[in-house]
Amino acid sequence: MSAADVVRIETLGEGALLLHFGEHIDAACNARVQAAAMRLRRANLAGIVDIVPAYASLLLRFDVLNWQRDSSLASALAAIDSESTDAVEIGRLHEIPVCYGGSHGPDISDLAAHAKLSTDEVIALHCGAEYRVAMLGFAPGFPYLLGLDAALHAPRRASPRTRVPAGSVAIGGAQTGIYPRELPGGWQLIGRTPRVLFDVQRETPALLAPGDRVRFYAIDEKEFNSLLAAQG
């Protein structure tokens, strides 16, 4: 079955299309989205000014003065359908240090109790997986990561916090993520990284991009403070 047969197309005003690849959050669907985004960037189709992948959809923004809807859409679908998802480039691997528990991860004990695990087991499971950045959203640079061990799936907090520190590593449902700056949030906080996830002064402000891979490793408070100080 071709991409044109399975992709649902939604028009968003005069200058954008939203391509729907599925209705559920799963790695296979997101792999199709990432593959489509990669192929469209490679195709360099006239009139496309932005390509924004999400969990199960892909936003295409167009220069309304430089595209013909029918021909441009046909070209886009042909590019999407040109290869299998096996051809997706492997994203960059980021190894992210995390200080787990304590004041940096105030919810880790409750999450461990929910999972019927010790906190050490929670940390081992969280560090033992390789995650894929499915999308950025909620706030600039906030990565939604797929690959969380099912034993760590946990509901969001009943009462969201009004302030979550920058760098907080959290779990919400079947996802894990990192708060790029101080924000309100309702995910379960299990640790904090000293890495800066988003900085407008960098050439590429967001540290992570859709399709990138992430592995976490545990550090202690002393190393956390040292790494934090080293970043100025």
Which stretches of residues belong to each language-model region?
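Glycine-rich active-site loops that engage anionic ligands at enzyme catalytic sites
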Residues: S2-G232
